[in-house]
Design a protein with these regions (language model features):
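Conserved glycine-rich Rossmann-like NAD(P)H-binding loop of the short-chain dehydrogenase/reductase
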Residues: 28-45
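C-terminal helical subdomain
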Residues: 189-190, 201-300
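A short, exposed helix-loop element centered on a Lys and neighboring polar residues
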Residues: 130-131, 174
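Active-site loop of short-chain dehydrogenase/reductase
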Residues: 4-5, 55, 83-85, 137-150, ...
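Rossmann-fold cofactor-recognition segment
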Residues: 49-68
Length: 302
């Protein structure tokens, strides 16, 4: 399809990235360049996306995002094939696999590599990909960049490096939006709820398809006015589901303690308050609530 929208989705071999790429191609008819290191997993994604009837496709692109030269070569390949990129979704993240063996330990008892895992393939990789894709969007004065982040950007969650990485993504979006705004290119941070993926098993959590439908809503249902309001800001999957009328694969909304409308409301309330580092009267969170050995059970695939 010549007129279909062109999307790049990183971290697409599994988890939320896979669900996002699948929905965009299979259900929305987009041409998706899906990146990951696992070529076999990408091949399976290509085959599943081909079952759709909208004419969308997934192009499997084996890519190590720690290799800047390889990322640049990938973007150049896309640039030679496409006149535009409508959407970039930065979903690649390597932190949870590194964090899992160390639940219950403070940061000074964890290997330094745990911190690097959260920031290198996550925050830094999102910056690199965005910096390389943005010129094409700026040239066309159109485009949307979505960073997949989490509530860890607002409050303590799991690990020091996890929170620093997610807070960094949120600020990355805000500052990029400020520089992109004159060119009608938008940047939005997306908070999924607790999810059920190959790695995570949050009770009552949302599926990767639900996250994919949230991204699709930003791409195809949000108006220019909607995107202008969300530009540089944090949107939540459950909020988008209410606003744009979609559900999870079950036909219902996720209803777990970490996902769904109620969880999103609690998160929004937390976001409305000053961050603890700026509020001298704020109480520090109890780190042990989400950094304990029992939490590791929520990540059986890590």
């Amino acid at each position: 399809m010549k007129n279909c929208k062109v999307c790049i989705v990183t971290g697409a071999s599994r988890g939320l990235g896979r669900g996002i790429a699948l929905v965009l191609a299979r259900d929305e008819g987009c041409r998706v360049y899906a990146t990951a290191r696992n070529g076999d997993a990408l091949k399976a994604l290509v085959e599943e996306a081909a079952t759709g009837t909208r004419g969308g496709t997934v192009n499997a692109c084996v890519l190590d995002q720690s290799d800047d030269a390889a990322v640049q070569a990938f973007v150049e390949q896309v640039r030679t094939k496409e006149s535009q990129v409508n959407l970039l979704v930065n979903s690649a993240y390597a932190g949870l696999i590194a964090i899992k063996p160390h639940f219950g330990k403070p940061f000074w008892e964890r290997p330094l590599s745990v911190f690097d895992a959260s920031l290198n393939i996550g925050l830094r990789s999102a910056y690199v990909m965005s910096a390389l894709v943005a010129p094409l969007m700026v040239k066309n004065k159109a485009g949307l960049i979505v960073q997949i982040s989490s509530f860890g950007g607002v409050n303590y969650l799991f690990d020091v490096g996890y929170g620093v990485g997610k807070a960094g993504l949120d600020r990355l979006t805000a500052d990029m939006a400020a520089e992109l705004n004159p060119y009608d290119v938008h940047a939005v941070t997306l908070y999924p709820g607790g999810a059920v993926t190959e790695i995570a098993a949050f009770p009552g959590g949302e599926t990767p398809v639900f996250t994919g439908r949230a991204v699709a809503a930003l791409l195809n249902k949000a108006t220019k006015e909607d995107l202008a309001r969300m530009n540089g800001k944090v949107a939540q999957t459950a909020e988008l589901a209410v606003n744009y009328g979609f559900t999870d694969v079950s036909g219902d909304m996720p209803k777990g303690p970490f996902a769904g409308v109620d969880a999103a409301k609690q998160c929004r309330e937390a976001m409305s308050k000053p961050l603890i580092q700026y509020d001298m009267d704020a109480e520090l969170p109890d780190a042990s609530a989400t950094n304990n050995p029992d939490i590791a059970a929520m990540f059986p695939g890590a």
